[in-house]
């Protein structure tokens, strides 16, 4: 036993610096701002005065800038955000939304058949859990290190990259306080083509699962019911995409989406605005095949203000 004591001491001396480095790294990663943590903070600060709340995925995140609303608005959409998290964010904030008049729910090509947990981006569930403090949409295994470690969540490779900047990193540097993130790289227009549009639609087709439908509709109905109890007007909006995207979509699915949303809007005085193929938008308004650029977002937000928030 006496021979083991020096070994244990050496082991402790070896592990102690490593443990300190790991703990320091975990703390720094936790403090590092990203779109989830920043949106949560901004929404908490502004929801009490907000008159318009926007929910949805990246087409809303990059396509709707509340700056151009005549009412005080905030955009709570995020990349690949599903109706489940739209619902959970609304539930979390609704009692503080004392002045909310309009709830804008954006619905895209894949929305009714999409859940994060059984998609290519299932890792995002843990971001909502870690940074929004929301219950994830699917049970996670206790053996998954991402449940406990920010190093595992961000991946060791990215963590090493952030460490070279001493974790002085903002992962959402262009996110405005109203929740909007502009897309301004003019060179991206070269990716707007029929070929790239097909690739994008193919990706979205791969995340469409019929079995998700019964769940997503239930989430949408719950969102509507929550808004009704607070006398908030619900508006469902389909954002515009460029023709290289919608011409490659499954036309039957587009029609089914439209009919379904129309039928929902017939109840409880819910309004539906379908801008998917709106001819007021041309190639110069788009960042890529299915996202508006800065100019397009200004145009779309102004249209929403004129045609919806009146």
Describe the function of each predicted region.
Residues 2-4, 250-310:
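Long, positively charged, glycine-interspersed low-complexity recognition regions
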Residues 6-28:
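Hydrophobic membrane-insertion alpha-helices, especially the h-region
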Residues 29-49:
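Alpha-helical transmembrane signal-anchor/signal-peptide segments
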Residues 51-53, 102:
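Structural motif
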Residues 224-249:
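Active-site segments of SGNH/GDSL-like serine hydrolases
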